[in-house]
Amino acid sequence: MAGLYEDAFVEQLRQGLVATAHEWGLPPHASITTLNLSENATFKAVDPETGHPVILRVHRPGYHSRTEIESELAWIHALRRDGIVTTPKPLPCGNGDAIAVMQAAGAARRVVAFEFMSGAKPDAQAESIVPAFRELGAISARLHAHARAWQRPAEFRRKVWNYEAMLGSRPLWGDWRDALGLTADGRATLERACRVLDEKLTRYGEGPERFGLVHADLRLDNLLVDGDRLGVIDFDDCGFSWFMYDFAAAVSFFEEDPIVPALQDAWVEGYRTVAPLAEEDVAFLPTFILLRRILLTAWIASHAETPTAQALGSAFTDMTIQLADAYLTQAERSLANQQG
């Protein structure tokens, strides 16, 4: 993974795209620049003659299978066809294939293309963030209703984001115990929090009314605001998980911000304009927030070379421990009140 964030490696990927751009009708002299480096590498290609931009996503080898990528694209096509959400159109290659394969940095790498979508990510500090979350709640409800009703292709395959895949015995994003700056006391707090999360989620269950196909990464970086339109991008993490997990993903990296309760209220309000939402589901939102936060702590631990991890450092781990401690304290109070 370390090579993904070195300039020389990124340049090899870019050169690979230069040689592959013809698959989408782009000329060899198209301008190709880096947009984002995370699980994958995302680039923006612009035809200098037309000025038309295309988004190119280079997949990390060994993470998603071809079938998983095709499944993501199948859901996006269905969502667009059914008018569920504004999201960029996947662009097939000239031969009709959904996925191109390029050789770069000594490996075959899958590439998919999308239309460019205008807009800017919501600002968590702006007054507009609350109405944006109200709209996001409505979008989430539509996504969840579609996921429940959609007849998936027989070969549809996406990862399952349950407790075991997040924090349990087969973590997809690494082990939070390797977190930057984690102390013995901090580890004990998180171990205790994980036990409580596991117990609560087991009781909550994975029935079809609570668990299904979700975007799973509706954080601010994957939302684009343009006027009154709130668009959703990057379905790369979509998979099977709890529907309420989508709210937790939306407050990624700022879970401790005092505005989160107001955002939760707005999200729930927006959700209920589209579909019913039980109070028990709402009551579980703090559980999913902590689940996501510890998962992000694991991701940072396993991606310590990334710009995100380096910017957040051990302070992110410290805040995760504080959030876990506050969650445990609240859980103890709730239990005492029930027993009293």
Range-by-range predicted roles:
Residues 1-31:
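Juxta-kinase regulatory segment immediately upstream of eukaryotic protein kinase catalytic domains
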Residues 243-276, 292-308:
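Active-site activation/catalytic loop segments of kinase-like enzymes and analogous catalytic loops
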Residues 36-51, 55-56, 90, 195-244:
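Active-site acidic catalytic loop and adjacent metal/ATP-binding pocket
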Residues 61, 96, 111-125, 171-181, ...:
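A glycine-centered beta->alpha junction motif in the catalytic cores
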